[in-house]
């Protein structure tokens, strides 16, 4: 791994099915509110065992080291309660925890709760397995920029993605079919302004249907198409880190 890489991706998606047990994660009283800020981070986590229990905290630490006072919101997506360290969570600063009511919905949850709560003006939405290694000027990423882009269309799930886009409505489907005009968003991770996300509110018409790895993968294209629809110039400055398939050996299935 090159030391010049400002972000590291430890893993993409755990192969195991998410547990049906819902944790009781709550934000300690001294962490429930922070003042509105121009920038914040949203980490979507899913703890399944001792190993994955370390990911979100390492991600939190990597942010804190470079952005000491920036607010962080951690969205818990159906973690196994046996591996949640409530004492550790109570010691974190400028940090809130949100328990999702949509189990196994995955990355889209970061946007759903950011749209709903507007904790800050701009959010960096990442997985719990992304670790920031160097300072990035995320404030310059407006109104939206992917963390990694997907250049290939070889992973497109045309049948299911078409079905979901039809349920969302609008004119997104015609853009989806014009493959040269958009790129995928790896892991549905992006830097996004709240005002811009408001334009994409129809995306959450299908949030209750995102319950499998296949559905979550489809959102890499659906989210991207909606971003391009509302901001066609995205193609000129697409992502922070470039094409994920050219990224040096920092990711894989675990």
Task: Enumerate the language-model features and the residues they cover.
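ER/Golgi luminal nucleotide-sugar-dependent glycosyltransferases, focusing on the catalytic module
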Residues: 6-254
